[in-house]
A protein has these predicted regions:
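Carbohydrate-active catalytic/glycan-binding domains of CAZyme proteins
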Residues: 16-338
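Basic side chains
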Residues: 2-3, 316
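Generic cytosolic/nucleocytoplasmic N-terminal low-complexity/intrinsically disordered segments
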Residues: 1-2, 39
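Sec-dependent N-terminal signal peptides
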Residues: 3-13
């Protein structure tokens, strides 16, 4: 009897540690990029709003108009702090609409917010806004990053250099480009062709420009062949994130129309990366988008789902849960319906 009780107690405690929790109830946020700055956890999410745009084609109903910054003093804190609006669409000279998933990097005490938005011609570009504080407010540069396109910037610091990763299919417009040049018409590769890749570029010293032409990131299967466009369970769709663990580089992303978070492992920021498996099975809602961060020697997955809005794809809520590796360094798959 004592044994059973001890087992139940232990399993309850361990379940409580693993279970995800929602981070914010009052407003809808999504696509959280989490970072530890000055010993605090900062979250840079998209700010979802209900919208008059009813047609979901190409993500038009993700019609966000501003960014907020959220923070936690520690991971267990019950109420996430909202620092309020830190950048508005109307204060970005070049942007017309759709402030999608952002990320932030710190360099020499300044904070750089990277964000996608559609310009006046309806093309997604990536902009930068700068602040002296992690919680903003941020001031946008007058123009987007020269040569930028598509969505979902994620900035990664490695050996003193900063790299920007980006790209997203369909609504994210990656099919409109080849070799960094716009096509006359968007063209999807056919199923047997190589899948479109996320992009990477070194950032300039001042963090405001690409210091090189964006390059393709190769994601390979177990035989060393690039993943094919028809491989919807494994190929890149959007929402790339990169982190290191035991000196290896983990590139994680959403598979979009199959709604999974998956990852691939490489040995430097440019790759190639070899596909490994699923991090998170589909959540409630069409999109899945995440970040992975080490906090106090433990690893966490920040993500979103649409359960609290009753499954409305464009009204998403932030979540966090512990992420675990097995003894070989593979990420243990988590259930998106938890
Ligand atoms: O939030 C708008 C878009 O939905 C993001 O940019 C994508 O990653 C997807 O989550």
């Amino acid at each position: 009897m004592k044994k059973i009780f001890t087992f139940l107690l232990f399993s309850q405690i361990s379940y409580a540690q693993e279970a995800p929790r929602y981070l914010f109830d009052d407003l809808y946020f999504a696509d959280p990029s989490a970072h530890v700055f000055n010993n605090k956890i900062y979250l840079y999410p998209s700010h979802d709003i209900d919208t008059e745009v009813k047609d979901p084609t190409n993500g038009g109903h993700y019609n966000m108009k501003d960014y907020h910054v959220l923070s936690l003093d520690h991971i267990g804190q019950k109420k996430t702090k909202d620092h309020g609006t830190v950048l508005k669409l109307e204060d970005i000279p070049w942007a017309e609409k759709q402030l999608w998933a952002p990320d932030v990097a710190e360099k020499n005490g300044k904070f750089y917010l990277y964000f996608p938005a559609k310009d006046k011609e309806g093309n997604f570009k990536i902009g930068v806004a700068v602040s002296n504080k992690p919680e903003g407010p941020f001031t946008a540069e007058k123009k987007p990053i020269k040569g930028s396109y598509s969505i979902d910037p994620a900035v990664f610091k490695d050996n003193g250099k900063y790299y920007i990763y980006f790209g997203g299919l369909k609504g994210g417009q990656l099919e409109k480009y080849r070799d960094n040049e716009p096509l006359a018409q968007a063209k999807e590769p056919n199923d047997q062709e190589n899948a479109l890749s996320p992009k990477i570029a070194l950032l300039s010293q001042n963090m405001l420009e690409f210091a090189e032409k964006p390059r393709d990131i190769q994601i390979l299967d177990e035989k060393g062949n690039p993943l094919k466009a028809g491989d919807h369970d494994r190929r890149f769709f959007e929402g790339v994130w990169i982190h290191t663990y035991n000196k290896k580089y983990y590139l994680s992303y959403s598979t979009g129309d199959t709604h999974k978070l998956v990852y691939a492992i490489g040995y430097n920021p440019y790759g190639p990366f070899t596909y490994q498996g699923e991090i998170l099975t589909p959540v409630t809602g069409w999109t899945t988008h995440h970040s992975i961060v080490e906090i106090d020697h433990k690893w966490y997955l920040f993500y979103h789902d649409s359960k609290p809005s009753g499954g409305k794809n464009h009204l998403r809520s932030l979540k966090v849960r512990k992420l675990e590796y097995d003894e070989k360094g593979f990420i243990k798959t988590m259930n998106g319906q938890d």
